[in-house]
Amino acid sequence: MAVNVQQYLNKEYEVECDGQMVRLKPVKAWVLQPKGRKGVVIGLFKCPNGKTLRKAIGKIE
């Protein structure tokens, strides 16, 4: 089952940057699916202060 990660790149998500919730679009997104388990879509976000963080932004059934 192929997942289109492009659809995740166009949405904004709430992420926590230095204790504040900020709405950001991911810089990059990829699928993380360990063997024998359901997968998740991980997004890479760049906070306004320069920090980068990862967050699960979707589930694969």
Curated annotation (Swiss-Prot):
Keywords of this entry: Chromosome, Cytoplasm, DNA-binding, Methylation
Recorded GO MF terms: double-stranded DNA binding
Location, primary (coarse class): cytoplasm
Signal peptide residues on this chain, from the entry's feature table: none
CC per GO annotation: chromosome; cytoplasm
Post-translational modification: Methylated at multiple sites, to varying extents.
Compartments, record wording: Chromosome; Cytoplasm
Quaternary structure annotation from Swiss-Prot or TrEMBL: Monomer.
Similarity field: Belongs to the Cren7 family.
Known function: A chromatin protein, binds double-stranded DNA without sequence specificity. Constrains negative DNA supercoils.
Protein name, UniProt field: Chromatin protein Cren7
Source organism of this protein record: Caldivirga maquilingensis (strain ATCC 700844 / DSM 13496 / JCM 10307 / IC-167)
